[in-house]
Amino acid sequence: MALKIACGQIEIIAGRPDLNTKKILHHMDMACQNGIDILLLPELAVPGYFLGDLWEQTAFIEDCAAYGDEIIAATENCGELCVIFGNIAVDNSKRNEDGRARKYNAAFAAQHGKLLTNGTLPYDFIVKNALPNYREFDDNRHFYGLRQLALELDKQVSGLHQPLTVTAHGETVKLGLMLCEDGWTENYFLDVPQLLAQHGAELLCNISCSPFSINKNSKRHRLFGSAAQKAGIPLIYCNNVGIQNNGKNIFTFDGCSCVYGSDGWLLTDAPMYAEATLCAGWDSKAKAIDTSGITSDPRSEIDEVYHSLRYGCQRFLEQAGIGKMTIGLSGGIDSAVTAALFVDILGPDNVLLVNMPSRYNSPMTQTIAEQTAQSLGANYTVIPITESCLHTSEQLTQTPIHSYHQHRDFQLTISPLIYENIQSRDRGSRVVAGLAAAFGGAFSCNSNKTELTVGYATFYGDICGALAPIGDLWKHHVYELGRYLNDKVFQRQVLPEAIFTIRPSAELSSEQTVGTGGDPLVYPYHDKLFRSFLEQWRKTSPVEILLWYSEGTLAEHLGCEADIISEAFPDARSFIADLEHWWKLMHTLAVAKRIQAPPIVSITRRAYGYDHREAQLTPYFPREYHRLKAQLLND
């Protein structure tokens, strides 16, 4: 008789061990009713993963341990069912390196009211070995890892990776149990899946709490499929769904749990962003796994982007208790896409769109804004800002300021740039914020990633709000998402065609018009340039950019068309001037603006916030850059 194994892809609510335990116990009941022998649940299924320094609160940790004990005790009434789940484990007799009680990111296997053990540790749980410390992960800040424990025990860490034997109804399987990062072997000297296989594991099980990013599933399939093939045994990957945040980044967890055969091929997978139970049968005689499921069709990149943003925004609003959104609608692509996204999530009656024209806003963008609101069926109003901005300007320039040091009065002057910022702040801090308070709910930040990179936003103006739904989208992503919303989501032209063809412009002065543009960014080039500074694992700098430019390989390295670069910059001098201009902007006031930006729904391999950590420094150009620059300008 085959053992029935189920992967419980559940939604985890970070910081709510009570709700998570209730859900786990429900899934255990369902597993019992359906004759499941082994139920896998995600990593840190009880507390959640991204909790900030809540990990330092003793009362919370004690609750997590108590809820874990409830789960263990509940297996006494579940027949042969073995439940494997992630939770924090605490050893109060020992200390972490920060002086606090010893904490482990651990996997527990419970059956008949007791914990199973592989006999290699002084504990009755499995300790996570690889504690990630990159991007949003900060595991060493809170947890003690297996490598540290091995050193303390004076043992080889490789010998501590042993399989866990589970028996049900007379059938036995040796599970190679791993926690998330232990299966991502590319950058670690220990190959945990292979060690487990060498030590007798018959089936690899990876329980994870792994956030989504674009193309991460492809990498996951490649790594885990390769691990299964190399070990010559099947692998089950169990992930959760839901959202979690670190204060500055909202991460979505896509689930996509799956089963790989011993040949590395994907046998079946769970849906994206949905709770599900993935089942498989283990033949202990044939040492083989069988699934009756099917695999999902691959999604396009923009399809993944849409579903991730929608899910992340929806869950964020639900958890925050926000049922209405107010959005400033300019007639441009960014605010239109944001508006369509929230209408899709909340329905048109719960979205208020406001156009706030000044004397610089063209009839064209005002018409586009109204057409967009009408097509979406949302609430709409127009509140002009010319008079209020002039009033603010007059107050600032005509009100005398007295110097008690110099014993004189003086007055301020308003430059064109200051007046541009007055308009932005009037729209954001006065109109949109006021409407949101009166309408109920919150308002959004419409900044995209390209704008955030160079600080194209105004403090307390357009860089405020409850969240930034498109803050991790480059400009080309925003246009693609707009097309997707028309074609796939609403299946009609809710975003007018003109919004895709009009020249981007802030419309804050007479020099910024939809006719002349006024936007110095060449998005097909600058999107790729800025992305190389931020998202490449080995971050580029002006040194690499100038080197590739001099070699004629820049377009190839950035992934853009060569003629775009040559048309935008006819000579080396103009290219260098542009490069230095944006590099300086990116590393000066733009950093402070990003620090103060609302939380970003994060979907790329590096998002601003606490995924890409920044200090407020001054721009720096390495010595090699100055050498290359001199060489290019003197040729």
What do the predicted segments below correspond to?
Residues 1-328, 339-350, 355, 375, ...:
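Enzyme catalytic cores with a strong preference for nitrogen-chemistry domains
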Residues 3, 173, 232-233, 244, ...:
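ATP/NTP-dependent adenylation/nucleotidyl-transfer catalytic domains that generate, transfer
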